[in-house]
Amino acid sequence: MKYFVVALTLAVAFVCIEECKTVEIGYAVSEDFDQNEIDNEEARQAFKTFTPDWNKIRNDAKRMQDNLEQMKKRFNLNLEEARQAFQTFKPDWNKIRYDAMKMQTSLGQMKKRFNL
């Protein structure tokens, strides 16, 4: 019972502390909001006077599009080569089974040797 009372007291104290932080944070946010309204007005004025360099933007977009086309061509070529290699791949299942059994035997011997 004593531990329950202590735990309950700590929980109430924690909730009170968190509520105080929330009130302080809310007040700080409202102060910042007033400052942000001024900053937003400055941003609006700066945006009105902003004139983008459309030629540079078009050139950058064209260059990115060309790079994308080159990547597509290169990827499709490699994808086709991979498809052909996969179709011609014929695994030797007997050798794979034999290797797996050999590894399993080696693993069993290692377990015995190291008492695993």
Curated annotation (Swiss-Prot):
Signal sequence segment: 1-22
Motif extent (Processing quadruplet motif 2): 80-83
PTM description: Cleavage of the propeptide depends on the processing quadruplet motif (XXXR, with at least one of X being E).
Protein keywords: Pyrrolidone carboxylic acid, Secreted, Signal, Toxin
Localization in the cell: Secreted
CC annotations in GO: extracellular region
Propeptide regions on this chain: 23-44, 80-83
Protein's UniProt keywords contain Metal-binding: no
Modified residues (Pyrrolidone carboxylic acid): 84
Keyword Iron-sulfur: no
Motif (Processing quadruplet motif 1): 41-44
Tissue: Expressed by the venom gland.
Primary location class: secreted
GO molecular function: toxin activity
Notes concerning its domains: The mature peptides (45-79 and 84-116) probably form alpha-helices which disrupt target cell membranes.
Family affiliation: Belongs to the cationic peptide 03 (latarcin) family. 06 subfamily.
Protein name: M-zodatoxin-Lt6a/b
Biological source species: Lachesana tarabaevi (Spider)
